[in-house]
A protein has these predicted regions:
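Short glycine-/acidic-enriched loop or helix-start segments at secondary-structure transitions
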Residues: 17-19, 45, 87-90, 111
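Structural signal for conserved beta-strand scaffold positions within catalytic alpha/beta enzyme cores
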Residues: 35, 79, 100-103
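Short, solvent-exposed loop/turn segments at secondary-structure junctions
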Residues: 13, 83-84, 104-107
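Phosphate-binding/catalytic loops
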Residues: 88-141
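A short acidic, often aromatic-flanked loop/helix-cap motif at beta-alpha or helix-coil junctions
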Residues: 41-43, 70-71, 106-110
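Mid-chain, well-packed structural core segment of small domains
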Residues: 69-97
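Cytosolic catalytic domains that perform sulfur/thiol-centered chemistry
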Residues: 2-7, 69-80, 120, 140
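Conserved active-site segments centered on acidic
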Residues: 1-68
Length: 141
């Protein structure tokens, strides 16, 4: 059985790292999950804190930049963007059929600390639900 490659991609790696962490908890033995960003990768302690509420560690893997080779190798590319504050990246026509988009708020848009923390918690919950729904798609495929 060939292992599928699922690539989570977001602007600064924050939401894609959260998605990778949730996805690695799925019971899918034939799937490899990686994450990356289309802009400079950013790190924040809020990622670990939001995931630790669910006893999940953030991924230790690198942020993979979307190279032509990686995009071609991926079986599914999950592009996570905030439609209010970001523009989703454009992809070559030959890979459009393997791209899905999740419109999930960018928690870094919040400035005040209490609101930013609440936003991270909400984003973590939304990504968890999206990943769980993705599991059903992958099982059926």
């Amino acid at each position: 059985m060939t292992q599928k490659l699922i690539y989570f991609l977001s602007q600064t790696h924050i939401r894609s790292a959260i998605a990778e962490a949730w996805a690695k908890r799925l019971s899918l033995s034939n799937v490899k999950f990686i994450s990356g960003s289309w802009h400079k990768s950013k790190s924040t302690p809020f990622i670990a804190e939001a995931l630790n509420e669910f006893a999940i560690e953030p991924p230790e893997s690198l942020s993979y930049s979307p190279s032509s080779e990686l995009l071609a190798d991926a079986d599914l590319i999950v592009t996570i963007y905030d439609s209010v504050h970001e523009t989703a990246p454009k992809f070559p026509a030959n890979i459009q059929e393997k791209i899905i988009y999740w419109d999930i708020d960018d928690p870094e848009q919040e400035i005040a600390l209490p609101q930013k923390w609440a936003s991270y918690q909400e984003v973590c919950d939304n990504i968890a639900l999206s990943v769980k729904n993705l599991e059903h798609v992958l099982i059926e495929a």
